[in-house]
Amino acid sequence: MADTSLMPIPGQVDPVPAPRDITPRADGRVDLMGLPKARIQELFAEAGLDAKQAKLRSKQVYHWLYHRGVTDFEAMTDIAKTMRPWLAERFIVGRPNVVEAQHSTDGTRKWLLQTDDGHDFEMVFIPDADRGTLCVSSQVGCTLNCRFCHTGTMRLVRNLTPGEIVGQVMLARDALGEWPKGRMDGLDDVEDTGHYSADGRLLTNIVMMGMGEPLYNFDNVRDALKLVMDGEGLALSKRRITLSTSGVVPMMERCGEEIGVNLAVSLHAVTKDIRDEIVPINKKYGIEELLQACADYPGASNARRITFEYVMLKDKNDTDEHARELVRLLKQYNLPAKVNLIPFNPWPGAAYECSTPERIRAFSNIVFEGGISAPVRTPRGRDIDAACGQLKTAAQKKSRAERDREAAAEAEAAASQA
């Protein structure tokens, strides 16, 4: 029987609880991905293990899942051989399904992923000289309708579960060979040459800046990030994780208290009229209310500054006056801030153009002169539509039937050569 647990589905600006059917696996097994150790222990007890065995086995399985990236119970060598088939009959360690993997000329990688119930979403890995950043999605689609963002042209399909969110991190580590036994079969689609941190990790940072508004899927995002930050699991420091919001003000304090990661705010305009147009949530939570929530954000300090994202749109939000007003607002609220200036990344049908390089530099200089760091973000992955604001699932760009025809043609060609 389908589980009809509540899932928050945001309307135009605020989440509204709404039921949705969760289709169980056809084989009846329970996916452990995205579950904390305590829940795994409960499931093992419900499946018939006594309390002592449930506690021991959950600790072992949790370690293999999140610390070593193992998906096959037979590979969990410190678990009794007789126990491994018992686990495999009842449980599974899932990953998002990979539909397509793309590699940009600048090293950026994008994966088109699919949930078990057939919904597509994307994640992006961006390598730099001293770090490797994974851009993670929180929803399939989005409701915020930001005018400059390709994802904003999609309807919201559903929230991603904790397993589907943390599964993106697991999948990226699979592909990058981040586990003790190296690359996972079938995922080493692109060779990487360098390591970006002292401990040899390629994936050093996570940004919740993929598809969707993370604070409209707060519980699932929180639960997933707790697994990522757990010292017995993926063990990524909260200082290396940034959550980006378009300004869901009522959830920002909880974000700081319950998750505690770095905060980024999609500001993009400094006047009500312009922000109402390009970031419609501003009609509900205005600039002043948003900036006050930033000033109150738990943990914000000069050592942990809030990042304000500002996409540069030609003749829309890029004048000297806009730059000076940005400085004034951030100083008015005494915010420990830095500003990321983002050249607009074009996509088919977009209503805007990117500001000229000269205009962007002039804007940046004014903000710098005002005492606030304002670097210009280098666009990454434009050639594979992986840059900021370009994510939109291939299901929207290319029909599934087209992809099926292409796959059938490839299979037929391979068979003819055999």
Swiss-Prot record:
Can you cite a GO biological process for this protein? rRNA base methylation
For S-adenosyl-L-methionine, which residues are the binding ones? 212-213, 244, 266-268, 345
| Lineage, top ranks | Bacteria, Pseudomonadati, Pseudomonadota, Alphaproteobacteria, Sphingomonadales
Q: Where is the composition biased (Basic and acidic residues)?
A: 399-408
Which gene underlies this protein? rlmN
Q: What is this protein called?
A: Dual-specificity RNA methyltransferase RlmN
Give the binding site residues for [4Fe-4S] cluster.
142, 146, 149
Give the source species: Erythrobacter litoralis (strain HTCC2594)
Q: Which residues does the UniProt record annotate as the domain Radical SAM core? A: 128-383
What GO CC terms are in its UniProt record? cytoplasm
Give a yes or no for keyword tRNA processing in this entry: yes
Could you say which protein family the record assigns here? Belongs to the radical SAM superfamily. RlmN family.
Q: What does this protein do?
A: Specifically methylates position 2 of adenine 2503 in 23S rRNA and position 2 of adenine 37 in tRNAs. m2A2503 modification seems to play a crucial role in the proofreading step occurring at the peptidyl transferase center and thus would serve to optimize ribosomal fidelity.
Per the UniProt entry, the disulfide pairs are: 135-388
- Chain segments carrying region Disordered: 1-21, 393-418
